[in-house]
Amino acid sequence: MEEKYLPELMAEKDSLDPSFTHALRLVNQEIEKFQKGEGKDEEKYIDVVINKNMKLGQKVLIPVKQFPKFNFVGKLLGPRGNSLKRLQEETLTKMSILGKGSMRDKAKEEELRKSGEAKYFHLNDDLHVLIEVFAPPAEAYARMGHALEEIKKFLIPDYNDEIRQAQLQELTYLNGGSENADVPVVRGKPTLRTRGVPAPAITRGRGGVTARPVGVVVPRGTPTPRGVLSTRGPVSRGRGLLTPRARGVPPTGYRPPPPPPTQETYGEYDYDDGYGTAYDEQSYDSYDNSYSTPAQSGADYYDYGHGLSEETYDSYGQEEWTNSRHKAPSARTAKGVYRDQPYGRY
């Protein structure tokens, strides 16, 4: 066989028209390989020390002959091809659906099959899935085994398995429709929330304590979370303590506000300090004496610039503030420090 192969290649090369450039190139490459001895089958070894990446491929037959009415290609692809994409990402492999029946347009598939192009040779084979891995030897075989185990689930002709239900839910979500009771929920997977449906809000009771949602049954024996009041059983209280529902009782942990700081500097109410010295007994004596003795002349009344001091200014301010002219004159005599007439001359 090998003796006849090289002469056949040489004869085919001579018979080819020069316009077939790609065919001539391929024939020349094949002749060179055979002459160098690369065409012989050699034993393949795996070097795990160098751990060089290797290419591993395997064809998995799709059982369309046993189950001709089941759409295996649709189940493998999923909505918008997402199922096959996720399967490749999970197994870290490359998967391709090839063979007869892999294309939707049957007329175009037949046309491409008859075209004779190398990339369409797979259309002559049975429908299959090509799994390819490019990784170090140990990891490559591990990925291939994982891929074979996972793709087996997609080759079971079941219309109501978990994969089919998940695909129906995903298709409903992608179409923008609302999920109804006709689409069952996949076990072990969360239900998809449709658009426009708000998330359940967490209600808070009085005092900031988180309350349980209405209709949620808490199993018996479950510990109550911190900060949540238990709804079953009476509220236990110690002897002499008020119940939490009593009105007027401050909540637990309540601290009274600290007393207001004393005014030490001139602030918002600093005008009180200006009138604070006018409320002693000596000031009242000077007010009464000034009103009990009338002014002698107009000059005495207007000549207030002479002998002006802080004590007289405070007394004048208190005169308008307290209006002491309706009081009876004090029986006590004024001391020598104060004058009988605050606006009189010396």
Curated annotation (Swiss-Prot):
Residues 213-267, 318-346 are annotated as: Disordered. Phosphorylated on tyrosine residues. Isoform 1 C-terminal region is tyrosine-rich, but isoform 2 lacking this C-terminal region is also tyrosine-phosphorylated. GO terms for biological process: mRNA processing; regulation of alternative mRNA splicing, via spliceosome. CDD domains: KH-I_KHDRBS3. InterPro entries: BBP-like, KH_1_KHDC4/BBP-like, KH_dom, KH_dom_type_1_sf, Qua1_dom, Sam68-YY. Residues 212-251 are annotated as: Interaction with SIAH1. Belongs to the KHDRBS family. This is KH domain-containing, RNA-binding, signal transduction-associated protein 3. It comes from Homo sapiens (Human). The gene is KHDRBS3.
